[in-house]
């Protein structure tokens, strides 16, 4: 992400280049894949014009532009109605609000194609334009019952209907590498759809049952259960839970919390003076426990994460601040499990933790304790 004239945007060409470099590396190490599939974070997208050229910039979900349109969208379609249709958690950065910003600015006027980030990266490998289901559900515009784009939402927000095409399920074929890609990487391969929302892929690999929850622990912590049907009720809306699409049309009933983002940015603010293990040991050396809302808006994209956290809990020594971050995360997980039991009418006995954050033994320990 980079700041471009006050707007947080993705260096999309860099992302494309890194994907292609990663594919080329397969040939270098002698492990040529028969298929390639891409997953990424949700909600962000790329618009293409009729010539399949990018309409830039590709704005990041961490940009604050959507804060100004929440009330406008709610006047057109209430959050209660949106949730009843889509089952998606209210978050200021949801695609629905980003697209509404683009409509107001005129950015959609010349848009012919709408691709979520993994769809776009697959397009750059194959020159085939297709949309995938699981990531599309993070837009807040896919009907949870029909599993199709909700035409009523699209019409009421006056979004161009031609942007929203067929939604393909995971494992569907996209196409083979273009000749240009083949020449660069040194081989051909078939590109297919993964569950292209990264959490959908992570959950697909989780051995969860009816009495288990998963925590996909990465930049975000996503906590939830799998369900054959969307769970849309007063309790789930009040607790702000999402019903995101999963493999085989299973639903990921979950809630998003800030996760390793807090530690990543604190470490960056300290000029990477400490490793993550050293930060963990500092936290363990402290007995200080203060709680804060890990989803506080001030933590989404602060200039300085350490300062932002201390604004919530008071100015504390580093070890104490880190301890409070750990305990606040673990308590948020506990609260989410309590809400799942209430909303989904389940008793939770096991927690499966996947993702990079699963390497944090102290956070795992606190999660078990809470």
Which stretches of residues belong to each language-model region?
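Short beta-strand-loop/turn "lid" adjacent to the catalytic site in phosphate-handling enzymes
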Residues: 4, 28-61, 86-93, 118, ...
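N-terminal glycine/serine-rich phosphate-binding loop of ATP-dependent small-molecule kinases
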Residues: 1-57, 67, 84, 110, ...
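Short loop/turn motifs at secondary-structure junctions
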Residues: 31-32, 163, 330, 347
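Active-site core segments that coordinate phosphate-bearing ligands/cofactors
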Residues: 67, 74-87, 92-116, 122-130, ...
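Short, conserved phosphate/pyrophosphate- and ester-handling motifs at nucleotide-, phospho-/glycolipid
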Residues: 11, 63, 198
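Short, intrinsically disordered, charge-balanced linker/junction segments flanking boundaries
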Residues: 1, 163, 355-356, 367-370
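A conserved helix-loop-beta module that forms one wall/lid of the active-site cleft
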Residues: 151-172
């Amino acid at each position: 992400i980079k700041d471009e004239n006050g707007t947080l945007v993705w260096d999309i060409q860099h992302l494309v280049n890194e994907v292609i470099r990663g594919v080329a590396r397969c040939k270098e190490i002698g492990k040529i894949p028969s298929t390639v599939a891409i997953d990424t974070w949700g909600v962000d997208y790329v618009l293409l014009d009729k010539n399949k050229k990018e309409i830039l910039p590709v704005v990041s979900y961490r940009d604050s532009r959507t804060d100004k349109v929440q009330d406008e969208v709610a006047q057109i379609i209430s959050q209660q109605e949106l949730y009843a249709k889509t089952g998606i958690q209210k978050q200021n950065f949801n695609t629905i609000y980003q697209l509404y910003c683009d409509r107001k600015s005129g950015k959609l006027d010349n848009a012919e194609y709408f691709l979520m980030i993994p769809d776009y990266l697959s397009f750059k490998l194959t020159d085939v334009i297709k949309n995938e289901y699981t990531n599309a559900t993070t837009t807040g515009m896919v009907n949870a019952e029909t599993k199709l784009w909700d035409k009523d939402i699209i019409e009421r927000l006056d979004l161009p209907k031609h942007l929203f095409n067929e939604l393909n399920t995971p494992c569907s074929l996209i196409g083979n590498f273009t000749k240009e890609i083949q020449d660069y990487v040194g081989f051909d391969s078939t590109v297919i759809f993964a569950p292209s929302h990264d959490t959908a892929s992570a959950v697909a690999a989780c051995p969860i049952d009816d009495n288990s929850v998963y925590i996909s622990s990465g930049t975000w912590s996503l906590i939830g259960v799998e369900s054959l049907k969307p769970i849309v009720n007063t309790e789930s809306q009040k607790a702000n839970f999402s019903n995101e699409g999963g493999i085989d049309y299973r639903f990921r009933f979950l809630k998003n919390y800030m996760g390793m983002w807090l530690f990543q940015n604190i470490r960056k603010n300290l000029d990477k003076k400490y490793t993550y293990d050293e930060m963990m040991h500092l936290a363990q050396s402290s007995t200080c426990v203060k709680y804060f809302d890990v989803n506080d808006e001030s933590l989404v994209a602060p200039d300085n994460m350490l300062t932002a956290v201390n604004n919530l809990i008071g100015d504390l020594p580093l070890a104490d601040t880190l301890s409070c971050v750990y305990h606040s995360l673990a308590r948020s997980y506990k609260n989410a499990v309590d809400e799942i039991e209430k909303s989904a009418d389940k008793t939770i006995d096991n927690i499966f933790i996947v993702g990079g954050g699963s390497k944090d033994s102290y956070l795992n320990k606190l999660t078990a304790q809470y």
